Amino acid sequence: MKKRKILIFGNGPSAEVVFKILKKIEKFEFIGFIVDKKYIQKKKIFGYPVFDFKYLVKKFPKKEYDIFISVGYSNMNLNRETIYKKIKKLGYKCPNIIDPSANIPEDIKVGDNNFIMNEVHIHPIVKIGNNNFIWSGSIISHHVKVGNHCWFTSGSSVAGNTEIRNNCFFGLNSSIINNIKVGNKCFVGAHSLVSKNLKNKSVVISPPSTKHSLNSEQFTFLLNNKF
């Protein structure tokens, strides 16, 4: 099978992680990273060149090259959405990057430019749009609909029959119970539980843990003597 040449748009932490997963997928031949010139921090990453986006069309024709957009969740994923739309308008294909260990049924519907990491579990009868990042250990349950340009941090859990719109962020180990509707641009913080529908631009944050007055040695001494 002839491998498809591919570039990663981005040179930050998420782009580095995507690169590591992409290298596991045999159908791709990785060429290098590409970003706007003002964001180029170094000439090479992991030994691969970082190209100036200005020369994309000239150097890398769309018939021969694909591009995966790997930009973070800043500005409620709008930065990544803007770049995604720009590259799609130029006619490039943006394939999904899915870790081979991800548990994904064959019958789910998935758009393009989705990053699905290792040990993600997606149940049957799920629809996922475009340009979403689903990090390791996340669970997307049956009959869930996910829109576009969302970010699911590691350990996120979405229960069945839930509908998530666009440009949402879900923090570490956040959970959504079943039959919930989540509007556009919602922010759900780490360890938060969503049990009611969320309107557009809602923010849900779990109270932080309290720092104990005892230090670790005093606390463990108490525990040992208590039992």
Where are these regions (language model features)?
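Structural signal for interior beta-strand "rungs" in well-ordered beta-sheet cores
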Residues: 96-212
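Short amphipathic alpha-helical segments
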Residues: 19-21, 46, 80-83, 128, ...
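Phosphate-bearing ligand-interacting subdomains
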Residues: 39-103
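Alpha-helical elements of the RecA-like P-loop NTPase motor core of helicases
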Residues: 16, 20, 78, 148, ...
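Short glycine-rich anion-binding loops that position phosphate/pyrophosphate groups of nucleotides
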Residues: 14, 72-75, 210
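Short, basic/aromatic-enriched C-terminal tail that caps enzymatic domains
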Residues: 204-227
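Nucleotide donor/acceptor-binding cores
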Residues: 4, 65, 184
